[in-house]
Amino acid sequence: MEYRRRSFLKSLSLGALFPWNILDNMFFLNPNANRLKEFYKKAIIIDGLIIPRGWNDESFQALDDSGYTGFSASLSSRNFQVAMSSLLEWNEKIKQNSNKLILANGSKDFFIAKMERKTAVLLGFQNATMIEKSTDNLDFLYKAGTRWIQLTYNQ
């Protein structure tokens, strides 16, 4: 048991240095690396924060290579108008790439994404400034796809 734990800890430190190659490098440390790769392929993997700017074909390829089931996209929250524009832009991006992406409105969408070999996108903000001074804006933001607001950089 101690050997496996140490191997796992070594592999974690390798992940910090070589995040894209961690699973390929683990066979040096763990004789059960193939089992780990299979587990990763079957698991629901969600990246908790992606800043979704400047997406192109390479971005989609990197996302596909990552094996992520979904991610939380942190959109621009400068004000209500900018936030709504960001939400509309990402809703359109998801529609235009429906062969790769689905809009995540709840946990079931991550399971659907996994089954359909797509990536679920959970839209949200790292700030609440886009609410401005009207809690009514929360309803509009929710209807447009907002599913999380993180109270981090409030001003």
Set out the residue ranges of the language-model regions:
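N-terminal hydrophobic targeting/anchoring segments and the immediately downstream early-domain regions
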Residues: E2-N154
